[in-house]
Swiss-Prot record:
Signal listed as a keyword: yes
Source species taxonomy: Eukaryota, Metazoa, Ecdysozoa, Arthropoda, Chelicerata
Entry domain remark: The presence of a 'disulfide through disulfide knot' structurally defines this protein as a knottin.
Source organism per UniProt: Cyriopagopus schmidti (Chinese bird spider)
Name of the protein: U5-theraphotoxin-Hs1c
Summary of the tissues where the protein is detected: Expressed by the venom gland.
InterPro entries reported in the protein's UniProt record: Huwentoxin-1, Huwentoxin_CS1
Purpose: Agglutinates erythrocytes.
Amino acid sequence: MKTSMFLTLTGLVLLFVVCYASESEEKEFPKELLSSIFAADSDFKVEERGCLGDKCDYNNGCCSGYVCSRTWKWCVLAGPWCR
């Protein structure tokens, strides 16, 4: 009787430890995933914003997808409002 209770208690403790370890690994995975996404996202934003807001004139063009604003003389997104 004492042996079966001891084995049951040991099994429950072992189950608790395994569940806790796997849960802590699962918590680390989203953090690593989000940090890698934001690292890649920040690299993309640097490239995307490379021309947005840069000073320009009609001789010195902007990046593709941007046009030189006639009013403010900086690069803005191309659209019907920029004509």
